[in-house]
Amino acid sequence: MDLDGDYLLPGLVELHTDNFERHLMPRPKVHWAEMPALLGHDAEIAAAGITTVFDALGVGEADTDSLRGAPWDRVLEAMDTAGARDLLRAEHHLHVRCELPAPNTIDLFTPFHGHPRLSLISLMDHTPGQRQWENLAQARIYYTGKKGWSHEKFERQVAHSATLQAQYAQPHRAYFVDYCRTHGIALASHDDTTAAHVAQAHAEGAALSEFPTTLAAARAAHERGLLTVMGGPNVVRGGSHSGNVAAAELARAGLLDILSSDYVPGSLLSAVMQLVQDQVLALHQAVATVTCNPARAAGMPDRGELAPGLRADLVQVHMAELPDGNRQAVVRGVWREGRRVL
């Protein structure tokens, strides 16, 4: 295979992307049909060089008009149909994100019970004043800006969220930890802020610390053997949108294991090349964060590397020279299990 000077990389492995949810609800309160949403998401994933994707679907939300407050049955049916009819370019798995303080989290998880694509569960708590939103000032900016809340509504929601957390978070946490243990599902903690958060996750059997918000939490995760996951957009933008620790800072400290595209599929390759361009990581180290490291974390030793006997999941990447002197990674070809899908 002559790639005319382009890079040949292993197919990217994505453990956490919210992109499917964006296709299912492209605007607030606008619900898109499940099959075209799935196929549009799948095409975008493949175009980003991702050959194995864990679609992150959230369960638990007071607002029943939101995706995370509504049943997922029809979405799972679409995934089953598309898989059975060979309509998908990438290999899709399920990553269920469980909002622990929400009253309906366990009920909304029911359709996922025993689903063959279920491979990862993460435990979330987005209560203002906790974890990602430990800084209430940052939380206020986010909710009044993106959500359009008034300051009065924000104050009411903070109080209401604290009440729900006190009632539901711990019993829901115990339920999902037990589910993962008894069903052999990988467990991830989310937005760890302190060493105590990491210690709890480790005791519960978590393998991943998703988006640790502080250097101390990331260091504690490594000390206890948890792999850290940070967002590609964090690298590309030069920092966290919610004011937390920068992914590049963790990489410099040797504390970055895995990159996730989070909410922008194309950010995986862009982040890899950004880390290399900024001399934060060598090329092979940066590529490992989106290939062999997530593959091993997911228990998939058959992919993530270019080696005899492994799956022929491949990505051809061209580095285009731009007028401003920068270089842009461009996906020119994608193969999954030896078959060209893009």
Identify the function of each model-found stretch.
Residues 3-75:
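Metal-associated gating/positioning segment near the N- to mid-region
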Residues 11-15, 53-55, 90-96, 119-125, ...:
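Hydrophobic faces of well-ordered beta-strands that scaffold small-molecule active sites
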Residues 60-192, 262:
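Metal-coordinating catalytic core of metallo-dependent amide/deamination hydrolases
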Residues 96-107, 192-196, 200, 208-210, ...:
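Active-site glycine- and acidic-residue-rich loops that bind
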Residues 115-119, 201-208, 223-229, 253-257:
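Glycine-enriched alpha-helix->loop->beta-strand junction motifs that scaffold or abut catalytic
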Residues 167-169, 189-191, 209-218, 237-244:
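A general structural motif
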Residues 182, 224-234, 238-317:
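His/Asp/Glu-enriched, well-ordered alpha-helical/loop segment
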Residues 292, 308-342:
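C-terminal cap of metal-dependent C-N hydrolases
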